Structure formats: structure tokens, C-alpha cells
């Protein structure tokens, strides 16, 4: 028989068939059995029929040119790339097939999909609560589990109230593609229960992305009854900007070797073996930290902070607190701060603890589900997400015994951590991205990274760059205005209490003022309106004028009070700040407008009192009022051009970048906006939707129709101040004033020539070419071009007149016959009206009669 079949029964793995593989010089060492099989010159692939078992493990040899070595004990798989994991995988473990009707529907897919060589770890108090996954028997190195199963969400389809604890990111060409959510046990598999590893020593699984799936690979042999703990492989961690497993080991060794005796004593003190580990409250941690000397020399390692920049993918446009965009959770590398650091008389310049900032997903003060989430989530939340024995602070991975001591760090607003600071509360109207997490331990050490000068004033001068505060280069220009300028103090800083210099190391910090006040921050995406301004101000005044004012900011002590887009202008008060959230009944909504609104069919009619234009929403009316007031709060930092809406400014950016993302599929011409492309497509289709109601003329653009209507209305807005001539188009007036005005001082031509030139100017002014050229005036010098053409026409006429006079002299006075070549080209002559006639110069055709000679 030409094919050589090789079937190996591994006695330590029951009911397992090993797939024969095509190999040349094949050698394998059977684990635990130490059995050596060698097959030479076997070139054909032989496929064995595997048994129907969810835990079936299929053997795959490592392809090498010569002798294939199956012994990987010396390989350091933590340094492998995702491609190496996929290529050198030895065993493949498939999920147990799940049938909802097989067991009467008593188990969910996440539990029923567990392979037979694994077991669930249940909580002691609740036998049905899964808190981890352990091995049932020996699992060799190089075994692959997976793929991970869950619900798939793109960045735009994530539910508003989604629990991101079990989110896994999938990348395509180094760019974020979608999420896999394992939260729903009915739609996920057993891999959702695997807990994350917190050090390289405990890690035995590496998470890799192969294609668009997530797999778990064993990077070391796993004995029976050992828990499976996973962390990202090197490539995956690099995409997420997370530390490699080796870096976790460095942190572990640095922290444990500093003082092992003190480390072990605190371990026994904080976590007695007889008491289950649990989450500590802020009060308990303060009690444990009452003796600062105990923690004096612990965690002295200086680890450079890193920021998870790629987590910006989770930002929601509506600023939902469910998906915060920027870092909110701060993890201390050292032990919790001693009480000496918490005193109000803390001197500046004292040694500060180093913080590592992350872009977290929503944290919760309540205990998380016992089963583990993705390692990504474990870095973003310090609350325990696995079993009580695995509640670990992700940034102290080498200290699993101290993991609960940082559980207070994810206390959110309105909870115990922030409430413990008397008299201080964050402004509720701040966008979620601007609100860092606070707690009772170090609210004084959190400062936003503003550049602070010696007098305590903000030194930021760039709105679009925002230099140090480089979070919102374009999304929040109004907020940036409040931070720019050296004369504007930061709204939440007291200049008297600021030091001469403060560090701007990139950590998110914020100092509460000595006398806390509520601060006004304008909304990022809409016009700033004083909804309820008078309700929280003692003094108010409004100007008699009814036009909106520019959206700038003023200061009174430490209170920022921006002007409104409506005409209501409230005088700042030194006693309190305006609060846009707490509105009073007598000052809400449309009542902030400078004029009353009418009602139509019982509904408020949002009508402009200037042009009587109506709108469906109050916000649209407020934006429209800027057109009449001239307010343009959104400025381009390149050309300083102003816009009434943020969307217009963002569209304007394409002018400077030269980007033309929209392409015509007919002629492949590119445009910067969809509106320009839509107008261009009318040239190919011949569509002219704008028709004149007076004449049959049609136009592709409304502006052309608007200019055409002037021909019927005789509207001539452009007038010469010297000779009182008027024109429809501005370019016609410019040609007239360019040395062609008979009453002007710069006129250097004879009056007859000037009269003829002005006749041609008027003829051009009423033509359709003038309408088209006026649209091109920004890119072409229309005035010079028109003047050149008119002078050429006049010059040609003068030459023809000279030729006519010359022929008359040669042939005699009035002896021109009908056969004369001068009139052969046209049997009609042109009679011109005098230039003083206010009517347009329309050519009048008169038939030329034959001149006969008179008798003597």
C-alpha cells in the first residue's frame, strides 16, 4: 500500500484520534508517554476519521524542510507573532457542538460549548455562577482554542447601554474594524469566562487574531486543575498599546524585590487566607493606609506612563457617558496615598506619585460579573471582573495579592469617592470626555494638562492645535476659545493658590478651587444660548438692540460667562455663575430670544423677525440669526475666515488641504463637496431645474437664475459715482471705472472712443456671459479679460470704418453700389442708440438700399 497511515493513540488523552500528516522524516515525542514514532518517506496526506467529540484534538505537525521537531519546550512563545502562532500550532481544540433542544434548554451556549478537556470553576456561594475555566487534564504547549464567538458591532452600531466588559477589538490592516461582544451568554461561547493574566508568570494562554477571529493558544504546558489565564500576544498588545507580557514581569520583579518581607507581611495583613478576597471601600482603604510608614518603600519603580491613543475609536458623537472618549481612570503605580498627602496644607513641590492613564470604558462601583472579560477591559477598570481570587489591579500585575486595594479608583461621580470631598462637585454640564474620575484619595492631584504661566493664567494661544490640551483640535472650537489667551484664568483654578510652575507631564489632573463655583462651558456642537441665564444671576440686563452677539467669553473673578447668540446679554455677577442646566420656568427655550414668537395651530412658530423665514427647531433659528447679526464664531486658523456653523468650517478645511474626495464617475473630475459634484453632474445629464417664470430660460444653478432675473427687473445695483451709469454686474462697473468713464480724471481716450467702449460694456452687462464670468471672478481676473475683449471689438470696428472711408475716397462720394465688397458680407447695417439712453442697447436691423447715381 503506497500511502503510509499513522495513527497514534495518546493514552493520557482519552477518545482522541490524531490526524496523520504529510511529512518527510517525521518525528514526534508523545507527551507523558515518551513514545517515539518515526515515519520516513511518507509523502501523501492521510486523513483519519475523527470521532464526534467536542474535545477532539487534531494533531498538526510543524512544517520544516528536514526533520520536523515537535518538542517546543525550549521555545519562548510569548515573543511569537500572530503568524507564527497560526503556522506552528500543534493541536486544535474545537468547541463542543451546542444544541438548544438537546438538554431541554437548561444550559446556555456559553456553557454548553465548553470542550471536554476543560472544566468551569464555580463560585463557592453559588454553584451556578461561573468564575473561571480550569483544565480537566494535561494540555500540551501549542494547543489552540477558539474561535471566540459573540455579537459583532461596528463603531456606529454599538448599543447605547452596551456593557463593554466583554468587548474584543478586531483589526483589519492595522485599523480598527469591529467589536466582538461576549456579554450575552446565549450568543457567545465558553471563552468569555477565561480570566485575564496579570503577570507573565501566571499567563498560560496568548490571545491572537488570525484573520477576523480571536484564538487562544497555550504558551506553556498546563497541568490538570490549573486555571486558564489569557493575555494578548505581542502583536495584539502592540496594536492596543498595552504592555507586553515581558513588561508585566518587569513590573512584578521591581515591585516584589524591593522589600519582600514587607511585601509578604502586607499580603497576610490585607488578605487572610481564611477570608475570601473582596472589593474594598474607600473608608476601609483609608483605615488600612493610616500608617504611612508601612508603605514607605513599596513600589518605588519609575515606569514611564503610556497612553492608549487607539481607544479613541470608542468616542460617540453625542458625548454619551457610556462611551467616554478620553482618559478618565488614573491608576497609581505606588501604594495608595498616605494621609500626609491628603491634607489641605500640602506644599507644592513634594514628591508626587506617578500615574498611568488609560482610556477606559465605563466603570462601575458595583461588583462586576464574576466571569472574566477581555484583557483590554481589565486594564481599563480596576474593579474585579473575575473570581474573588482574581480581583486584580491591572497596572500592578505582579501583585495579585494587592489588587483589591485599588478598587476605589473607579468610583464614579455621585458616589462615595467624590462625595467625600466636602463642598466640591464637578460641573454637571461638562462633556464626559472632560470629566476625569475622582476619589477621596487624591482629588487635589488631578489637573488638566494646561500650560500654566507664573501668574497662574492659561498660556494657550492656539485653538486648533490646543498644544498641551490636544484633545479636541476641531470638535470643540468654542470650548477652546475659553482656554486660549493669556489673560483668561482657568475657570477651575485659583490664581492666588497656584505655584510658580506646575508639571505638564500629560497626566489628567485637576485642582479644585478654594471657593468652588459652577463653571459655564459652552456646548461643543451648537450655538451657545443663555437658557436660564437670568435664573442663576442676581443682576441681569439686556440691550435694546435685537441682534445676536458674537459668542465670546468674559470673566468675572473665576467665572466664565460667554455671550449668547441671542440678543439677551446678562451682566456677570461676582456672587455666582450662570447655570445652563438649572433653568427657571420664566426663562427657558424660546424665551431667551430677543423677541416673542408667534403660535400657529397651537404650536410655536420659529420665525425670524428680520426676514420672516421660519424654522422647525429653535436651534436652527438661533443659528440663522447669526446671518443677520454677522456673528461667525467658528474661525479658520489658517485664513481667519469665519463661519456661522461648525459644519461649514469643517467643509472649508478641504480648501487648504486640497482634498477632493468626491469623484465624478463620468469624467473622473474630483470635487471637495457633494454639492459641487451634484451641480457638476447636471452638465452631463443636461438637467436645468431652475427655470425663469418670465421667459423660457433654464439654468443649472440657482445663482444663475437669480442673476438672470435682473434682466427682467432691470435691477442695476452697481453705479458709477462720477457719471451715474449703473450696471447689473460688478465686473462691468470695474471695466467702466478702469479708465473708461468719460467723467473720470483718468480718461485718456477721445470721447468718441469712450462712448463706443461703454456701449460694448452695456451690451456685455446684459449678456449671459456676464452671469457666468461673475461666478469665476474669484479664480480669474474677469475685469482684465472683459476689457481686453471690448477693446479688441472697438479696435476692429475702427479698422473697418477706416477701410470704408478709404474706399469711399477711391470710388467717389456716395458712389458705392450694392456690389461693393464692404456690404456684401452683410445686407444689414447696425443703428446704435445714443449712450445716454437709459434703455439697453439692442441692435436694430435696417435694410440697406441701393444707391443710384444722380443725373448732372
Curated annotation (Swiss-Prot):
Residues 373-393, 542-556 have a biased composition (Low complexity). GO terms for cellular component: cytoplasm; nucleolus; nucleoplasm; nucleus. It is an enzyme of class 2 (transferase). GO terms for biological process: adaptive immune response; aorta development; artery morphogenesis; cardiac septum development; cell fate commitment; coronary vasculature development; embryonic placenta development; eye photoreceptor cell development. Expressed in bone marrow macrophages (at protein level). Expressed in innate lymphocytes, including tissue-resident conventional natural killer (cNK) cells in liver. Expressed also weakly in tissue-resident natural killer (trNK) and natural killer T (NKT) cells in liver. Residues 357-399, 532-571 are annotated as: Disordered. It comes from the Eukaryota. The keyword ATP-binding does not apply. It holds the Pfam family PRDM2_PR. Residues 115-233 form the SET domain. It is found in: Nucleus; Cytoplasm. GO terms for molecular function: DNA-binding transcription repressor activity, RNA polymerase II-specific; histone deacetylase binding; histone methyltransferase binding; methyltransferase activity; promoter-specific chromatin binding; RNA polymerase II cis-regulatory region sequence-specific DNA binding; sequence-specific DNA binding; transcription cis-regulatory region binding. There is a cross-link at residue 847 (Glycyl lysine isopeptide (Lys-Gly) (interchain with G-Cter in SUMO2)). Residues 558-605 are annotated as: Interaction with PIAS1. Transcription factor that mediates a transcriptional program in various innate and adaptive immune tissue-resident lymphocyte T cell types such as tissue-resident memory T (Trm), natural killer (trNK) and natural killer T (NKT) cells and negatively regulates gene expression of proteins that promote the egress of tissue-resident T-cell populations from non-lymphoid organs. Belongs to the class V-like SAM-binding methyltransferase superfamily. Interacts with PRMT5. Interacts with FBXO10. Interacts with FBXO11. Interacts with multiple nuclear sumoylation E3 ligases, including CBX4, PIAS1, PIAS2, PIAS3, PIAS4, PML and RNF4, but not RANBP2. Interacts with LDB1, SMARCD3 and SMARCC1. Interacts with EEIG1; following TNFSF11/RANKL stimulation in bone marrow-derived macrophages, the interaction promotes the binding of PRDM1/BLIMP1 to the gene promoter of IRF8. This is PR domain zinc finger protein 1. The lineage of its organism: Eukaryota, Metazoa, Chordata, Craniata, Vertebrata. The gene is Prdm1.
Amino acid at each position: 500500500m503506497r500511502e503510509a497511515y499513522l495513527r497514534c493513540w495518546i493514552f493520557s488523552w482519552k477518545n482522541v484520534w490524531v490526524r496523520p500528516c504529510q511529512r518527510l522524516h517525521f518525528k514526534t515525542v508523545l507527551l507523558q508517554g515518551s513514545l517515539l514514532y518515526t515515519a520516513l518517506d511518507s509523502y501523501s496526506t492521510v486523513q483519519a476519521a475523527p470521532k464526534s467529540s467536542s474535545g477532539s484534538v487534531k494533531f498538526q505537525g510543524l512544517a520544516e524542510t528536514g526533520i520536523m521537531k515537535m518538542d517546543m519546550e525550549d521555545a519562548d512563545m510569548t515573543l511569537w507573532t500572530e503568524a507564527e502562532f497560526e503556522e506552528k500550532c500543534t493541536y486544535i481544540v474545537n468547541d463542543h457542538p451546542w444544541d438548544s433542544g438537546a438538554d431541554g434548554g437548561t444550559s446556555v451556549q456559553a456553557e454548553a460549548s465548553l470542550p471536554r478537556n476543560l472544566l468551569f470553576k464555580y463560585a463557592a456561594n453559588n454553584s451556578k455562577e461561573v468564575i473561571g475555566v480550569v483544565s480537566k487534564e494535561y494540555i500540551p504547549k501549542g494547543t489552540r482554542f477558539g474561535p471566540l464567538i459573540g455579537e459583532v458591532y461596528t463603531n456606529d452600531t454599538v448599543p447605547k447601554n452596551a456593557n463593554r466588559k466583554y468587548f474584543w477589538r478586531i483589526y483589519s490592516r492595522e485599523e480598527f474594524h469591529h467589536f466582538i461582544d461576549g456579554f450575552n451568554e446565549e450568543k457567545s461561547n465558553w471563552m468569555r469566562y477565561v480570566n485575564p493574566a496579570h503577570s507573565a508568570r501566571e499567563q498560560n494562554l496568548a490571545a491572537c487574531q488570525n484573520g477576523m477571529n480571536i484564538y487562544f493558544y497555550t504558551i506553556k504546558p498546563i497541568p490538570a486543575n490549573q486555571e486558564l489565564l489569557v493575555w494578548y500576544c505581542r502583536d495584539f498588545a502592540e496594536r492596543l498599546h498595552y504592555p507586553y507580557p515581558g513588561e508585566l514581569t518587569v513590573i512584578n520583579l521591581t515591585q516584589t524585590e524591593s522589600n519582600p518581607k514587607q511585601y509578604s507581611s502586607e499580603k497576610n495583613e490585607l488578605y487572610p487566607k481564611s477570608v475570601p478576597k473582596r472589593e474594598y471601600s474607600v473608608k476601609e482603604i483609608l483605615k488600612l493606609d493610616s500608617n504611612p510608614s508601612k508603605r514607605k518603600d513599596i513600589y518605588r519603580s519609575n515606569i514611564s506612563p503610556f497612553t492608549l491613543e487607539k481607544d479613541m475609536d470608542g468616542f460617540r458623537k453625542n458625548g454619551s457617558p457610556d462611551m467616554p472618549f478620553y482618559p478618565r481612570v488614573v491608576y497609581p503605580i505606588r501604594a495608595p496615598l498616605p494621609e500626609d498627602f491628603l491634607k489641605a496644607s500640602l506644599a507644592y513641590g513634594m514628591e508626587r506619585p506617578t500615574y498611568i492613564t488609560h482610556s477606559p470604558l465605563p466603570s462601575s462601583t458595583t461588583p462586576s460579573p464574576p466571569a472574566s472579560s477581555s484583557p483590554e477591559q481589565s486594564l481599563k477598570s480596576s474593579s474585579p471582573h473575575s473570581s474573588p481570587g482574581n480581583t486584580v489591579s491591572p497596572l500592578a500585575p505582579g501583585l495579585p495579592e494587592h489588587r483589591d486595594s485599588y478598587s476605589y479608583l473607579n468610583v464614579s461621580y455621585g458616589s462615595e469617592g467624590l462625595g467625600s470631598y466636602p463642598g466640591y462637585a464637578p460641573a454637571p454640564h461638562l462633556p464626559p470626555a472632560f470629566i476625569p474620575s475622582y476619589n477621596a484619595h487624591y482629588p487635589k492631584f488631578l489637573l488638566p494638562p494646561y500650560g500654566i504661566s507664573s501668574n497662574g493664567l492659561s498660556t494657550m494661544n492656539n485653538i486648533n492645535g490646543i498644544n498641551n490640551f490636544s484633545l479636541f483640535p476641531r470638535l470643540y472650537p468654542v470650548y477652546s476659545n475659553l482656554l486660549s489667551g493669556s489673560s483668561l484664568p482657568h475657570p477651575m483654578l485659583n490664581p492666588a493658590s497656584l505655584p510658580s510652575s506646575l508639571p505638564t507631564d500629560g497626566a489628567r489632573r485637576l485642582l479644585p478651587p478654594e471657593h468652588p463655583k459652577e463653571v459655564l462651558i459652552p456646548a461643543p456642537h451648537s450655538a451657545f444660548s443663555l437658557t436660564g441665564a437670568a435664573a442663576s444671576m442676581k443682576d441681569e440686563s439686556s440691550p435694546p438692540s435685537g441682534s445676536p452677539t458674537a459668542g465670546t467669553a468674559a470673566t468675572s473673578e473665576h467665572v466664565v460667562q460667554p455671550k449668547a447668540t441671542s440678543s439677551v446679554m446678562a451682566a456677570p455677577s461676582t456672587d455666582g455663575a450662570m447655570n445652563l442646566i438649572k433653568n427657571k420656568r420664566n426663562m427657558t427655550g424660546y424665551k431667551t430670544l430677543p423677541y416673542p414668537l408667534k403660535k400657529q395651530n397651537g404650536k410655536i412658530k420659529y420665525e425670524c423677525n428680520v426676514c420672516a423665514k421660519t424654522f422647525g427647531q429653535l436651534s436652527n433659528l438661533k443659528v440663522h440669526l447669526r446671518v443677520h447679526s454677522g456673528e461667525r464664531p467658528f474661525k479658520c486658523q489658517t485664513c481667519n475666515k469665519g463661519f456661522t456653523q461648525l459644519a461649514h468650517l469643517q467643509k472649508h478645511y478641504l480648501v487648504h488641504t486640497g482634498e477632493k474626495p468626491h469623484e465624478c464617475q463620468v469624467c473622473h473630475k474630483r470635487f471637495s463637496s457633494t454639492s459641487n459634484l451634484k451641480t457638476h453632474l447636471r452638465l452631463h445629464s443636461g438637467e436645468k431645474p431652475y427655470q425663469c417664470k418670465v421667459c423660457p430660460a433654464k439654468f443649472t444653478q440657482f445663482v444663475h437664475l437669480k442673476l438672470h432675473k435682473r434682466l427682467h427687473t432691470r435691477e442695476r445695483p452697481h453705479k458709477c459715482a462720477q457719471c451715474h451709469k449703473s450696471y447689473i454686474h460688478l465686473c462691468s462697473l470695474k471695466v467702466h471705472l478702469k479708465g473708461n468713464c468719460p467723467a473720470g480724471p483718468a480718461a485718456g481716450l477721445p470721447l468718441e472712443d469712450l462712448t463706443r467702449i461703454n456701449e460694448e460694456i452695456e451690451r456685455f452687462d446684459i449678456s449671459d456671459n456676464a452671469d457666468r464670468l461673475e461666478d469665476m471672478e474669484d479664480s480669474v481676473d474677469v475685469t482684465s479679460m472683459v476689457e481686453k475683449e471690448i477693446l479688441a471689438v472697438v479696435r476692429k470696428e475702427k479698422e473697418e470704418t477706416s477701410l470704408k472711408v478709404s474706399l469711399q475716397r477711391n470710388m467717389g462720394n456716395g458712389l458705392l453700389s450694392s456690389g461693393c465688397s464692404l456690404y456684401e458680407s452683410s445686407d444689414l447695417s447696425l443703428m446704435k442708440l445714443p449712450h445716454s439712453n437709459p434703455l439697453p442697447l439692442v441692435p436694430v436691423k435696417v435694410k440697406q438700399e441701393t444707391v443710384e447715381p444722380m443725373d448732372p
